[in-house]
Every structure is written in C-alpha cells, then in structure tokens.
C-alpha cells in the first residue's frame, strides 16, 4: 500500500468489549458543557442509561445537524431530576475505545461548513469565476471554495498588513490500520493522510518605520466527517513576515502526504506554484500553512474542539520567500535592485499526540522535511533586476554593462 485508498477495501471497526454505545430517543437530546479537562453531558434518562457507571467508556450518537460525536470515560453519574442524567467524564485513550481499526476514506470537504476566525476575518464569500488574478476557477466552483478577506492586522511592532486568501475545497485521504487488542502495546500497520488543496493569497504590507515584523494568523477551519467516527480537520494559517514594504501574491496547487507503513515513515509533497504582481523593496515572505488533523470523535464548542482522540497531525509551511538587495549609484541608473524570489515548502508531523508522539518515543525517524529551498534544484525560483523601479530586459544590469564598456574603451586608449 502506498497511502492510496483501495475502492474495494472493506472497512472494519471493532470496539473493545466493555465499551457501551448509548442510544437516545432523539439524537439531539443531549447537551455538552466543558468543565476544565472534563466534559459534562446532560442527557434524558431511558432504559439504555442503566449501563452508565463510573469507569465505563461510552459512545454517544452523532448530534442531528452537526458532526459532533463523543466517546467518554465516565467519572461520575448524577440524577439531576426532571428526567435528566448528568455525566462527567474525560476523553479516553484510543486503546480504551477500539480493538481493531482498518478503514480507508476519501472525501472532499464541504466549504459551506468553513468556520472563519472572526478576530481576523472581515468577510467570507464564495469563490467564483469573476475573480481577478486567480487562475484556479476552472476547477473550483462557487459551492466549494471561499474568498476570505482579512481585517488589517498588526505585523510585529513596526506596521500592518491586510490581504485576502482564496481557499478551494480540500480533498482528504485517510487510512488507519491499527490493532489495540493489547492495550499497552498498540500495533500500527499503517497511518496515512493526504491533503490536496489550492491556495491563492495576497498580502499588502504597510510599515510605519523600517524594521522587522512577523505574524502567524489562524484564518479558520473546516471539519469533514469521513465515517465510522473518523474526522479530518483542515486548519488554515498564514505566516507573514517582512522587513520594509512589500506586496506578495502567490497561487499554490499542493498535495502533501504523510505515511507510516509497517515501520517505514514517508513524507511526500507535490507543489506547483506561481506568483503574479509580487514586488518588494526589501525582504518578505507569505507562507500558507495548511494543517490536517485526523481524529476519532470530538465536539466543537465556541470554536474549540473538545473530546477528540487525535490520530495524526500534519502541517506544512508553503509559499514564496523573497530577498532584495539595493545598490545606489552616482550616475544613471541611480538605484539597482535585485529581487530573488523562491518557493519554500516544508512538511512535518505533530509529535504531541497520536502516531507522531508514538514515533518520536519509539523510533529515530526524522519527522520534518524541507521540500523546496533556495537552491538550484528548486523549479520555483527566479531572479529579477530592477533599475529605478523598472524591470530591465533579460534582467540585465545596464549600469554594469556601461561600466564594462567604459573600462574597455579606457583600456584601449591607455593601451
């Protein structure tokens, strides 16, 4: 297997024998309230509730109209009166819920479920064919893409930036093949995740004074229910930094894949990028940072996720970096600027939870990889030459050419 879904694969999910699946009269008839590290569930009593006891792991059904679903390790059960039970519990370990998991899923995210970060997002609209400067409309319809306009943000302590991000609907592939029969010794045969998405971003950077500023902003997320209790969260960040004043724009068609298969860990990334209208007086970068977290269960509450059993998290820093050097001359052209622009891509696995944490603790495998950098092997690399604000033909330096000719004439005269 190479991390690709087999359409003929039969998914198998086996729970531990002591796990109790709780049925409710109506799926939406329970409430969840976070209490520190615990969750409080208020649920109507019925004959299915007799098995809910301290120490028991229970599975609650998916709530109607949402993708919220919980697994809970019960700490206490209280009769609250009025026909209601109050259950306080914590998130169980994956080995306390599942005995065997062998599932392969592939699904495109529904961007109508995109949840923006209202602190930084001014507006969200549908992506359509009328957009200027965007070249992904041929494959992206209004139903599955979003344009996110950002509020003006502070960039470090030296200035501000504003801009926009175009997000197509990402396609997620997930494969989990694991055995938790021996709870203290889990066997991971394969954990693979793949994220395919297009990003077009533009940032306007305005500085009140020269200096260095940087900002990482959380733009928003979209959750996709893959089935069998398995979810994928695609989270979008932008990393913006600059020294001086810059306008940065790029488009990226990107696929990132992380696979752990029978003791072998692989990271793959396929990027096709382009930049239009990019200019800079000094240095800057605009990196899209898509993150893909694969999890079982979870409950979104006030833009926070509770009760999730995380399997794997993959994040990438992808986008353009640019360097500029300026030289002032005493004759025309007065100012020569060399602009060095290159695509950068790195991908890594989150080692705080799930398979990433397990690999960190049990292997010496490198879990971060730089795919593209500023070297000759990078196809997304270019150099531009400007003189007094205008790009020269063939990016040649006319000042240097004049100097070479003058020196040649001088040598002939002297010689």
Describe the residue ranges of each PLM region.
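Autoprocessing Asn-cyclization modules and mimics
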Residues: 2-54
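Ser/Thr/Gly-rich low-complexity blocks that favor extended beta-strand/coil architectures
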Residues: 14, 23, 51-81
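Secondary-structure transition/turn motif
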Residues: 42-48, 88-96, 199, 205-206
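Extended Gly/Ser/Thr-rich low-complexity repeat segments
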Residues: 47-65, 95-118
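Short, solvent-exposed secondary-structure boundary/capping segments
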Residues: 78-92
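Extracellular, luminal, or virion-exposed ectodomains of exported proteins
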Residues: 101-131, 135-143, 160-164, 415
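Membrane-lipid interaction segments
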Residues: 143-401
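Short, low-complexity, Pro/Ser/Thr/Gly-rich segments in the mature regions of secreted, periplasmic
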Residues: 394-415
